Amino acid sequence: MVLDSMLGAKRTKPMIIAGPPDTEARMREMMEVMLPGSHVMVPKFDLTYIDMKLMKPNQIGEKLIVTPYPAYHTAQTNPTSVRCEAGGKIVSYTGDSAWTKHMPKVAGDADLFICESYFYEKPIRFHMNYPDVREHWEEFGAKRIILTHFSPEMLAVVDKVPE
């Protein structure tokens, strides 16, 4: 994204990249792997990295507030679920995560809650399956829920899922 903005799109507008702690270092490492020598390149636009604080509203630019919550996935990935508020609307996303006690706060009153449901029946570490989603459906409290991150097993039975 940053490399394309610099080289392909010739971006001039400022860019903000917000994420868990170490986002800037991880982005720079990834860019260097994708394009060796990119560490010496200077974008022709303002590039700002923001390390978001967990369970606190983070102002991103003028119009966006993002509140990240701890997710349950491999610790090395700094897993987070996010709640995004802009223009009077709320969109939230579980990210890659098994059920956590924070999910109702992430989803509560959201206009759209994007919820992972990796398997239809099989329990798997670090992910929710469809029984998990159904068990907690009422706790989510979102106006609309869309399921995502389907495994081949889930895709094979997607017609059984009314959502």
Regions found by a protein language model. Name each.
Residues 98-163:
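Cap/insert and terminal regions of metallo-dependent hydrolase folds
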Residues 1-92, 98, 105, 158-163:
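Binuclear metal-dependent hydrolase catalytic cores
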